[in-house]
Amino acid sequence: MLVNYQVTLFCTTGQYRPVASIVSYEQEDASVDLSKNKEKRAPIIQKGIEKICAKRYWKGTVLKKYGYTKCKIRKVEE
C-alpha cells in the first residue's frame, strides 16, 4: 500500500526558508508510522531529498552549502 510522507529540510542558520516535498512510499502495513524508526526512514528521506533537488535544479552538494542539514518527516493523512 502506498503511504504519503512529507519530507521537510530545514536551514540550521535560519537564513533560508524550509523546503518540503511529498513522497509516496510502498509499505506493507499502512497503520505503522515509519517516521519514528531510524533505519526504515532513510529511504524516505533519500527520495525526498532527490525530489526537492530535482524540483529546484539543485545538486546534493548545494544542500550543505545552503545549510539544509536538518530533516523531518511526517505521515500525511489523505
Region spans (language model):
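Short, surface-exposed loop and linker segments with low hydrophobicity and enrichment for Pro/Ser/Thr
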Residues: 1-4, 40
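Short, mixed-charge low-complexity intrinsically disordered segments
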Residues: 40-78
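A short beta-strand micro-motif
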Residues: 3-12
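Generic low-complexity segments that are intrinsically disordered, proline-rich and/or Lys/Arg-biased
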Residues: 7, 19, 28, 44-47
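N-terminal functional modules and adjacent low-complexity/disordered segments of proteins
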Residues: 4-5, 29, 57-61
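A structural detector for beta-sheet-dominated domains
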Residues: 10, 25, 35, 74-76
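A short, exposed loop/beta-hairpin motif centered on an aromatic-Gly-Thr core
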Residues: 16-38
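Short, low-complexity, intrinsically disordered N-terminal modules
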Residues: 10, 31-35, 46, 59
